[in-house]
Amino acid sequence: MKITRRPEWLQKKVSPAAHADMERLLGGLQLHTVCQEAHCPNISECFRQRQATFLILGKLCTRLCSFCNVTKQTPLAVDQAEPERVAAAVELLKLTHVVVTSPTRDDLADGGAALYAATVAAIRNASPQTKIELLVPDFAGNQESIAAVVSACPHILGHNLETVPRLYSIRSGADYRRSLLMLEMIRRLNPAMKTKTGLMLGLGETEEELFQALRDLRRVDCSYLSLGQYLAPSRSHYPVQDYPSPETFDRYREQALSMGFEHVESGPYVRSSYHAEHYGTGTGHAKLSPAPAD
């Protein structure tokens, strides 16, 4: 039976007091995070632990996806000093694992690939021990851009599939097959590189559609997977169609692991970079943290 009202397991509280220190640090370095721009429900938990997913290439997106809270406007010029500021934050926070992502920049010839590569280089120079994960857009299928981020040699290179083919109309300008081909190309260019993707549940997908998407991902040898609950940022966004139970997420995780994914995070509050440091640890999944009481 589908649940269409927000259930009790999705009542995690946000604590602004937990944000103050991190927001001062990020503001001082003129940096953005997807945690803030996407109104992530895990922001208090992650900021309390001094973790953040850095949003480079500005905070304005050129696409109009109906599920996303990132602002859609004509972006500003690329800030070439941004990689060094991200690296400074990584060093100050003493991060052992960092995730860097961006809005889609269809206005740029390379989609922002060069700045991704520069950011990897800056982090590696400032904090050589930090594991670097990139979560990149599709670069409009530009193979030179994909090759550029692969050549930067992040430890993990992610690109989110987001949903099943039937529902791809919610992804403005995106193409299901193009995203799969991108993940396949990454592995072809560097067979040792770990690829990662994420899907949102509750958009109206069927279980068989989800499992077919997982089979498609295994066919392109995708290594890591995240499955999380879609939560509409506002009433003007695409409405939630269903709230799968925590037990359903557990079952999906076991199904995905049985298909050959090396690590799967699956739960209502799972997001692409949630517990990112646990991928590749050999545990299969992390124990999810309880919702903070404050």
UniProtKB/Swiss-Prot annotation:
One of its GO terms (cellular component) is cytoplasm. Its EC number is 2.8.1.8. [4Fe-4S] cluster 2 binds at residues 61, 65, 68. Binds 2 [4Fe-4S] clusters per subunit. One cluster is coordinated with 3 cysteines and an exchangeable S-adenosyl-L-methionine. InterPro entries: Aldolase_TIM, Elp3/MiaA/NifB-like_rSAM, Lipoyl_synth, rSAM. Its cofactor is [4Fe-4S] cluster. This is Lipoyl synthase. Pathway: Protein modification; protein lipoylation via endogenous pathway; protein N(6)-(lipoyl)lysine from octanoyl-[acyl-carrier-protein]: step 2/2. It catalyses: [[Fe-S] cluster scaffold protein carrying a second [4Fe-4S](2+) cluster] + N(6)-octanoyl-L-lysyl-[protein] + 2 oxidized [2Fe-2S]-[ferredoxin] + 2 S-adenosyl-L-methionine + 4 H(+) = [[Fe-S] cluster scaffold protein] + N(6)-[(R)-dihydrolipoyl]-L-lysyl-[protein] + 4 Fe(3+) + 2 hydrogen sulfide + 2 5'-deoxyadenosine + 2 L-methionine + 2 reduced [2Fe-2S]-[ferredoxin]. PANTHER family: LIPOYL SYNTHASE, LIPOYL SYNTHASE, MITOCHONDRIAL. [4Fe-4S] cluster 1 binds at residues 35, 40, 46, 273. Residues 47-262 form the Radical SAM core domain. It comes from Geotalea daltonii (strain DSM 22248 / JCM 15807 / FRC-32). GO terms for molecular function: 4 iron, 4 sulfur cluster binding; lipoate synthase activity; metal ion binding. Keywords: 4Fe-4S, Cytoplasm, Iron, Iron-sulfur, Metal-binding, S-adenosyl-L-methionine, Transferase. It is found in: Cytoplasm.
